[in-house]
């Protein structure tokens, strides 16, 4: 699929000078509220959530090629970002209906690709929960939904970043060894599917195809994959798509995420950057609530900066320019 000049220019605005997308993810809403609630008795206020996003944006966007925010709580943070930093805006409602089967997707009802673009977004990002082994009755709805968003983004000439999170309703714990065994196929088959031209996806935001906590040499406990098996899953991921793809950090520690990127590169994965969220900023949440804004700023300027700087150094030696795709 050939991209328009406008889409290419927009992806340029989200990348660094090497054609790598080193993006900061802070579109968390439900997950962020839960993190904040661990450190205070009353529910987090809108003002608290917005201010924390502003702090992270003010302190860290000078080190990121772009930032992913949500239009519900993230617009003040968008205004506060470094002027060289590109903007992705999330289009999906946070979370999913736990009482309904299928984790069906849902857009923010007050927003459209046109409105996100008018808000200054260089790209639209949408998160989809997808299980290639789910019933076709469920999956056909998801495919049609993504086709709609893809067509909307073509109409507005704005890049479409699709984030795919895999799951299995029969394995409730996606951090378990049981899920680790099925994860590679689920991740790579979903990537292959949504790389089809009919979806008009420009960049895939994906999980790494293995749970690194079960890779030989990365764990003291149970081993699900040898190093060579894990490396093969990364090679299969590379073969699954012709599109640029970037990795999400999935809430793992900064250190493990950086080690994972090195492993992916050494295995032969030509990934094109990251959208890294909690691995960079999560430690600021507790500090912000317990010690206030100034202490949180100090954390972001020291530990937060170190996390993002270390990540950028790793990306320089591991990621590949999306322009090579």
Swiss-Prot record:
Q: Could you tell me the Gene Ontology terms of the biological process aspect for this record?
A: 6-sulfoquinovose(1-) catabolic process; D-tagatose 6-phosphate catabolic process; lactose catabolic process via tagatose-6-phosphate
Which major enzyme category is it? lyase
The pathway where this protein functions is: Carbohydrate metabolism; D-tagatose 6-phosphate degradation; D-glyceraldehyde 3-phosphate and glycerone phosphate from D-tagatose 6-phosphate: step 2/2
Pfam families in UniProt: DeoC (PF01791)
Q: Which UniProt keywords apply?
A: Lactose metabolism, Lyase
Q: Does the keyword GTP-binding apply?
A: no
Which reaction(s) does its UniProt entry say it catalyses? D-tagatofuranose 1,6-bisphosphate = D-glyceraldehyde 3-phosphate + dihydroxyacetone phosphate
Give the family this protein belongs to, as stated in its UniProt record. Belongs to the aldolase LacD family.
Q: What is the protein's given name?
A: Tagatose 1,6-diphosphate aldolase
Q: Give the species.
A: Staphylococcus haemolyticus (strain JCSC1435)
């Amino acid at each position: 699929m050939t991209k328009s000049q406008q889409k290419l220019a927009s992806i340029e605005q989200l990348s660094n000078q090497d054609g790598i997308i080193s993006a900061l993810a802070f579109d968390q809403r439900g997950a962020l509220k839960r993190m904040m609630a661990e450190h205070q008795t009353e529910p987090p206020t809108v003002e608290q959530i917005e201010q924390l996003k502003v702090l992270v944006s003010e302190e860290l966007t000078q080190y990121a090629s772009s930032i992913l925010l949500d239009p519900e709580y993230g617009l003040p943070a968008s205004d506060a970002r470094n002027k060289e930093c590109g903007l992705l805006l999330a289009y999906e409602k946070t979370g999913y209906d736990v009482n309904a089967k299928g984790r069906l997707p849902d857009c923010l009802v007050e927003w459209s690709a046109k409105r996100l673009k008018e808000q200054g977004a260089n790209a639209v990002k949408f998160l989809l929960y997808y299980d290639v082994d789910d019933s076709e009755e469920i999956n056909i709805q998801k495919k049609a939904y993504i086709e709609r968003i893809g067509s909307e983004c073509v109409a507005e000439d704005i890049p479409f970043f699709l984030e795919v999170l895999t799951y299995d309703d029969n394995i409730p714990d996606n951090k378990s060894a049981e899920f680790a065994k099925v994860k590679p196929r689920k991740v790579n088959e979903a990537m292959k599917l949504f790389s089809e031209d009919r979806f008009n996806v420009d960049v895939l935001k994906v999980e790494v195809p293995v749970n690194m906590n079960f890779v030989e040499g990365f764990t003291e406990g149970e081993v699900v994959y040898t190093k060579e098996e894990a490396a093969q899953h990364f090679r299969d991921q590379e073969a699954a798509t012709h599109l640029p793809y970037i990795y999400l950090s999935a809430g793992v520690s900064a250190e493990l995420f950086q080690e994972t990127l090195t492993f992916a590169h050494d295995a032969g994965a030509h990934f094109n950057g990251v959208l890294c969220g909690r691995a960079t900023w999560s430690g600021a949440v507790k500090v912000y609530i317990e010690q206030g804004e100034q202490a949180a700023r100090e954390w972001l300027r020291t530990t937060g900066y170190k996390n993002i700087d270390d990540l950028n150094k790793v990306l320089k030696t591991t990621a590949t320019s999306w322009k090579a795709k």
